[in-house]
Amino acid sequence: MANRIDHEYDYLFKIVLIGDSGVGKSNILSRFTRNEFCLESKSTIGVEFATRTLQVEGKTVKAQIWDTAGQERYRAITSAYYRGAVGALLVYDITKRQTFENVLRWLRELRDHADSNIVIMMAGNKSDLNHLRSVADEDGRSLAEKEGLSFLETSALEATNIEKAFQTILSEIYHIISKKALAAQEAAGNLPGQGTAINISDSSATNRKGCCST
């Protein structure tokens, strides 16, 4: 997985991980991209990212996952990284009610800075700590439904629903750009050689076989 040669792909999708510090974003990133988990994971300083290439609807997609720091003092830095994102995983910790209460603030910031068509999933992380739960599964689902988001509870420690969360986001992004590509072809009269990048945002969902991203 980590050793796979991934320079050949059909699409590059940028996805941001957002949420309070300590909710497990970095471990979600390492579990999905390297199948690793670190019990002594330190808070992210600034921004870091990792990539993984996988198949989505028969296409080779390179997912570029950005882990943005949740601390208040870094929020001004991370806001710039919303630009170009076509997907987002908004994470809270099911054992810390305050991280759930802050979801709407993160969602508001995301919608202020990101493309209006961005695909968003909400994840209640650390489901392995069910005995310490302070946010009910129904609370998460209810808020996600109210805001029009997908929802899953996840565990980076046990690798529960990590794969499913990203596959869901990537598939939804692909469906959006596929519809846009079809509409563009119909508008162009299905003329051959219309090799353009089909994006839902600023050259971020980039068709490798079309033009280069900016």
Swiss-Prot record:
<feature type="short sequence motif" description="Effector region">
    <location>
        <begin position="41"/>
        <end position="49"/>
    </location>
</feature>
<dbReference type="GO" id="GO:0009504">
    <property type="term" value="C:cell plate"/>
</dbReference>
<dbReference type="InterPro" id="IPR027417">
    <property type="entry name" value="P-loop_NTPase"/>
</dbReference>
<dbReference type="GO" id="GO:0005525">
    <property type="term" value="F:GTP binding"/>
</dbReference>
<dbReference type="GO" id="GO:0005794">
    <property type="term" value="C:Golgi apparatus"/>
</dbReference>
<keyword id="KW-0333">Golgi apparatus</keyword>
<comment type="similarity">
    <text>Belongs to the small GTPase superfamily. Rab family.</text>
</comment>
<keyword id="KW-0449">Lipoprotein</keyword>
<feature type="binding site">
    <location>
        <begin position="67"/>
        <end position="71"/>
    </location>
    <ligand>
        <name>GTP</name>
    </ligand>
</feature>
<dbReference type="GO" id="GO:0010008">
    <property type="term" value="C:endosome membrane"/>
</dbReference>
<dbReference type="GO" id="GO:0042546">
    <property type="term" value="P:cell wall biogenesis"/>
</dbReference>
<protein>
    <recommendedName>
        <fullName>Ras-related protein RABA2b</fullName>
    </recommendedName>
</protein>
<feature type="lipid moiety-binding region" description="S-geranylgeranyl cysteine">
    <location>
        <position position="212"/>
    </location>
</feature>
<feature type="binding site">
    <location>
        <begin position="125"/>
        <end position="128"/>
    </location>
    <ligand>
        <name>GTP</name>
    </ligand>
</feature>
<dbReference type="InterPro" id="IPR050209">
    <property type="entry name" value="Rab_GTPases_membrane_traffic"/>
</dbReference>
<keyword id="KW-0547">Nucleotide-binding</keyword>
<feature type="lipid moiety-binding region" description="S-geranylgeranyl cysteine">
    <location>
        <position position="211"/>
    </location>
</feature>
<comment type="function">
    <text>Intracellular vesicle trafficking and protein transport.</text>
</comment>
<dbReference type="GO" id="GO:0005886">
    <property type="term" value="C:plasma membrane"/>
</dbReference>
<feature type="binding site">
    <location>
        <begin position="19"/>
        <end position="26"/>
    </location>
    <ligand>
        <name>GTP</name>
    </ligand>
</feature>
<dbReference type="InterPro" id="IPR005225">
    <property type="entry name" value="Small_GTP-bd"/>
</dbReference>
<keyword id="KW-0342">GTP-binding</keyword>
<dbReference type="Pfam" id="PF00071">
    <property type="entry name" value="Ras"/>
</dbReference>
<keyword id="KW-0813">Transport</keyword>
<keyword id="KW-0653">Protein transport</keyword>
<dbReference type="GO" id="GO:0003924">
    <property type="term" value="F:GTPase activity"/>
</dbReference>
<keyword id="KW-0636">Prenylation</keyword>
<keyword id="KW-0967">Endosome</keyword>
<feature type="binding site">
    <location>
        <begin position="155"/>
        <end position="156"/>
    </location>
    <ligand>
        <name>GTP</name>
    </ligand>
</feature>
<keyword id="KW-0472">Membrane</keyword>
<dbReference type="GO" id="GO:0015031">
    <property type="term" value="P:protein transport"/>
</dbReference>
<dbReference type="InterPro" id="IPR001806">
    <property type="entry name" value="Small_GTPase"/>
</dbReference>
<dbReference type="GO" id="GO:0005768">
    <property type="term" value="C:endosome"/>
</dbReference>
